[in-house]
Amino acid sequence: MKVQQYRLDELAHLVKGELIGEGSLQFSNLASLENAEVNHLTFVNGEKHLDQAKVSRAGAYIVTAALKEHLPEKDNFIIVDNPYLAFAILTHVFDKKISSTGIESTAQIHPSAVISKTAYIGHYVVIGENCVVGDNTVIQSHTKLDDNVEVGKDCFIDSHVTITGGSKLRDRVRIHSSTVIGGEGFGFAPYQGKWHRIAQLGSVLIGNDVRIGSNCSIDRGALDNTILEDGVIIDNLVQIAHNVHIGSNTAIAAKCGIAGSTKIGKNCILAGACGVAGHLSIADNVTLTGMSMVTKNISEAGTYSSGTGLFENNHWKKTIVRLRQLADVPLTQITKRLDHIQAQIESLESTFNLRK
């Protein structure tokens, strides 16, 4: 198969960059500084990468004007304010796109479902009663859309995804393999030593430009809906419980778990393996560092941490012993000791000042 080539001046135009060098050069792909060849375009994202750039074999470089001055031995550049953003834009140029439309013969679609003529429905897809699939949406093989599910325009639903509970997806949503949207929330009423299942009657609403990774679970609401606003991005292996509300442009990394009825604000970042207890509220513009555990409301923007960083093993054991010893000492006793030490310091300072 012939590889698509792009001229350097075409690529510069796409990112609104300034071309320096030979615009007619042809490029077949993007590549890292380390592995780029003469037919590859690469980018330099900061001064720390300049040493790599100087020895790279790439045919052209996406850089800022300031970074270019450090590469006098190179000839071909695209000058932009943000090289990483330009790189992100150009990845879509070189990405292999699914251009098929229509419905594969093995798909099972209920007669009441409304499927756009420009959509693609892959092999062994099952689409239930009263479903809607919008223009240019791709649904890969072995995916199931249960009754009353709606998927908007320009969406991509990868293989083995299940969307149920009457979930509604807006436009340009991407969902990757083996994720479940709208599954039953974890709701049970305890009575007389038994757990009594609560039927989940809400749904899941997903906004525009949302990206959800593989092997995620986003549960339908118990009564109200679980909501992901526009621009939310979610990594693999994330659990979002029933009635959670996630604000626009929030990013959630792998292995995070968010318990039920919690509301997370806009433009937040949850780093890997964070846990958020239920029925809490987190303000806009909050960052949680890796392995943080949120057990109370966060009302102000900022960066918060609770995960313990790595220790050498023997150091860790000694630290744990000290923590246990500290826990055995009453807080009032510690406070009295600190007050006594403070009084001694003040007495010494007073004596020293008098002798002056």
Swiss-Prot record:
Record-level Gene Ontology MF annotations: N-acyltransferase activity
Gene Ontology BP terms: lipid A biosynthetic process
Active site, per annotation: 242 (proton acceptor)
Positions of transmembrane segments: none
GO cellular component, one term: membrane
Gene3D superfamilies: 1.20.5.170, Hexapeptide repeat proteins (2.160.10.10), MurE/MurF, N-terminal domain (3.40.1390.10)
Protein name: UDP-3-O-acylglucosamine N-acyltransferase
Family: Belongs to the transferase hexapeptide repeat family. LpxD subfamily.
Organism: Acinetobacter baumannii (strain ACICU)
Enzyme class, UniProt record, top EC level: transferase
Listed Pfam families: Hexapep, LpxD
Superkingdom to which the source organism belongs: Bacteria
Function, in words: Catalyzes the N-acylation of UDP-3-O-acylglucosamine using 3-hydroxyacyl-ACP as the acyl donor. Is involved in the biosynthesis of lipid A, a phosphorylated glycolipid that anchors the lipopolysaccharide to the outer membrane of the cell.
Keywords, alphabetical: Acyltransferase, Lipid A biosynthesis, Lipid biosynthesis, Lipid metabolism, Repeat, Transferase
